[in-house]
Regions:
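Active-site microenvironments of hydrolase-like enzyme catalytic domains
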Residues: 63-79
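Amphipathic alpha-helical interface surfaces
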Residues: 33-36, 46, 59, 75, ...
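Catalytic cores and adjacent binding grooves of peptidoglycan-active enzymes
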Residues: 73, 81-156
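Extracytoplasmic cell-surface/polysaccharide-interacting catalytic and binding patches
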Residues: 1-43, 123-156
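A broad, low-specificity signal marking well-ordered, structured residues that form hydrophobic/aromatic
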Residues: 48, 77, 118
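Secondary-structure boundary/capping signal
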Residues: 48, 67, 106-109
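Extended, low-complexity, intrinsically disordered C-terminal regulatory tails
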Residues: 38-64
């Protein structure tokens, strides 16, 4: 267990990681995820408004998260841009960059688009095996999750 006061990484605060908690739980994978996230944020050159990052099991259940959510290990983040709806083409660009960054550090990424913003995550080994060790993406803007909707992202 690590205690933070303030930022846990450049551009990201402890309050964004786990709001309302003075205790921060991090796993080895969390640190790798933060490295990827910092690289993505530097590339994006815009503030990412964090909706959700680390969640306890109880918090995850309250928001309807799946039991295997990467938020439980701090390896997923939900975010949006201020006063901007992310387009399909922007999302695809984000996916390509996120996949590249994750590969550079030896992990496999995932991304989802929603009406409120974007989910970026790192697949755990079980998820990666199930997903054929490929970048996984989805579109939930309709209110129903559509898996792998963009053919041009199949081989990133």
């Amino acid at each position: 267990m690590i205690r933070f006061s303030g930022n846990i990484a450049e551009h990201f605060s402890q309050a964004e990681y786990h709001p309302g908690s003075a205790t921060v739980y991090m796993y080895k994978e969390t640190i790798t995820f933060i490295v990827c996230l910092r690289k993505f944020r530097a590339w994006l050159k815009q503030k990412m408004y964090v909706v959700s990052w680390y969640r306890t099991r109880e918090e995850n259940m309250k928001v309807g998260g799946i039991p295997t959510s990467n938020h439980l290990t701090g390896t997923a983040i939900d975010w949006h841009l201020y006063n901007h709806t992310i387009t399909t083409e922007e999302f695809k660009t984000y996916c390509r960059k996120w996949a590249q960054i994750c590969k550079e550090v030896g992990c496999l990424g995932e991304a989802g688009i929603y009406t409120w913003g974007v989910h970026l995550g790192m697949q755990n080994p079980t998820q990666a095996k199930v997903n054929g060790r490929k970048f996984y993406h989805w579109d939930s803007r309709s209110g129903k999750q559509i898996n792998l909707p963009f053919k041009d992202l199949y081989d990133i």
